[in-house]
Amino acid sequence: MTRLAILSILCASTALFCACTSAPGRPGPHSEVLPPDQIMEFNILYAQNCAGCHGTGGSGGAGNALRDPIFLAIADDSVIRNATSNGVRGTAMPAFAQSAGGMLTDKQIDALVSGLRSWASSRGLHDANPPPYTAKTAGNAQHGAEVYQTFCSSCHGPNGTGGKSANSIVDRSYLALVSDQYLRITVIAGRPELGAPDWREDMPGRPMSDQEVSDVVAWLASRRATSPGQPYPDSKNAQYLEHHDVD
């Protein structure tokens, strides 16, 4: 047998051996996809469930910036866990826990809470004590109108309908989508990704008190439509309803 023939046989044998140990369609050692309820890595869980609203890396989007140090200073783990598990009624924040109709296990919720907490830092606080996450007393909408003029009108306009540097915050569609708690968080922590100041920065050297935050939130809440999403009374709607049968 010639050397060429022997070499050919060896090559064929090697190829046959490799083919037997690596059958077509056989997954590699690192190619298996975990079932959704077994994914525990924070970055994956956040990207799949949170980033769409709260931004990549918690930078903010339609929802508030979860990486904001002020938010993490006032929202403890139980607050974050409850909102993640059960959602926030009356807002676009859904429930993620399986026990509340979502897709995540309790352990996955814990992984998200721990991951978010790892973002906490004292950066930007400078030993300041922000108002608490939850209001201590009910807000006074009438006084809130005065608070608004003092702290907010320079950006959002005298009536809240928008100014030179900020949009309307009394838009009925907007107020229908956010809760009082969301408004409170926004007043306290601001929206740094949008250039909105926190509770200390509206008037340098004069931070808002807890009661002032509660009062301005009450004033904003008083501007909500009673039945969001329904036709609002105006002359055009009245004329239409007068001449059409509407079931």
List the predicted regions and their residue ranges.
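C-terminal motif of bacterial Sec signal peptides marking the signal peptidase cleavage site
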Residues: 17-19
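Basic side chains
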Residues: 3, 81, 117, 184, ...
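Disulfide-stabilized extracellular ectodomain repeats and their linkers
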Residues: 47-50, 63, 90, 149, ...
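Flexible coil segments in periplasmic/lumen-exposed cytochrome c-class electron-transfer proteins
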Residues: 24-32, 36, 40, 44-47, ...
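Bacterial N-terminal signal peptides that target proteins for export
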Residues: 1-9
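Gly/Gly-Pro-rich "capping" loops immediately C-terminal to redox-active cysteine motifs
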Residues: 32-39, 43, 55, 59-86, ...
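Short alpha-helix boundary/capping elements
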Residues: 88-89, 120, 191
